[in-house]
């Protein structure tokens, strides 16, 4: 996929594998979005692996949309983006040469700060949530990320990180906002506090710095979330169980990685010991 705003996108899908793709010269390389579209179809169980994601630095040329989470918000120079989707595993990808971020994981509050407000209650009742849970980003080869960050959506974050002397712009960004609010009971009854199996985790992604503007472990206040930025190589260092391969049965025949595809690197049968 080349020269698009969204290189390849998984949107409002359950049980999807995105693998063995090349995404380059787009605005954002690989997108996993769960949007509040109100049709009872919302996303989870997505694996992103074995992809080559390089130089997705094209200017965002999408028209504005009435949906605050449309692709018009994608910051140029972003490799992989997860927006308000649960249960996502991102592993064994090559992610290189992105001006803004190699990986971004965000709640929908980044797109609309009122994402748990009255206008969203019918969609929340329909099954959508603005937070991300159980995201595991691990064992990716990430190089040269964040040399020239840009994008209207995250301009405040760019200013915060680049103008704070003890911080520097990270290659991996987690907003932390939804998790902080949920852990402080500020989203009840919409979203409970995160359990261990619902945390956002980053492991073994090389020397890439990880950052967040809102520390999930910091309490929000009555007036709102607490800005508590941090950057480090070992932030959010945890792991989650591997997600199962996605399969599809069509006209009685089953398809999927490890089912009809047994030759791709990640789909080969395990050796018999």
Could you tell me what each predicted segment is?
Residues 27-78, 100-132, 143-188, 208, ...:
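Acidic/polar low-complexity surface segments
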């Amino acid at each position: 996929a080349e020269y698009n705003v969204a290189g390849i996108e998984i949107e409002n899908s359950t049980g999807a594998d995105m693998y063995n793709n090349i995404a380059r010269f787009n605005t954002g390389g690989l997108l996993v979005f769960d949007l509040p579209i109100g049709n009872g179809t919302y996303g989870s169980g997505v694996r992103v692996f074995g992809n080559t994601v390089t130089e997705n630095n094209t200017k965002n040329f999408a028209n504005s949309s009435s949906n605050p989470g449309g692709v018009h918000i994608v910051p140029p120079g972003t490799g992989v983006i997860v927006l308000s989707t649960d249960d996502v595993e991102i592993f064994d990808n090559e992610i290189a040469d992105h001006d803004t971020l190699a990986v971004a994981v965000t709640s929908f509050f980044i797109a609309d700060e009122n994402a748990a407000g009255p206008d969203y209650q019918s969609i929340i009742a329909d099954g959508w949530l603005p937070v991300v849970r159980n995201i595991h980003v691990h064992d990716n080869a990430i190089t040269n990320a964040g040399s020239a960050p840009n994008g209207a959506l995250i301009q405040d974050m760019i200013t915060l990180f680049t103008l704070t002397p003890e911080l520097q712009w990270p290659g991996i960004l987690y907003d932390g906002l939804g998790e902080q609010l949920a852990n402080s009971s500020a989203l009840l009854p919409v979203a409970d506090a995160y359990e261990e199996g619902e945390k956002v985790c980053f492991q073994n992604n090389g020397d890439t710095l990880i950052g967040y503007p809102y520390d999930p472990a910091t309490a929000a206040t009555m007036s709102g979330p607490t800005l508590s930025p941090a950057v480090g190589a070992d932030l959010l260092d945890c792991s989650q169980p591997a997600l199962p391969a996605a399969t599809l049965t069509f006209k009685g025949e089953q398809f999927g990685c490890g089912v009809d595809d047994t030759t791709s690197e990640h789909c080969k049968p395990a050796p018999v010991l």
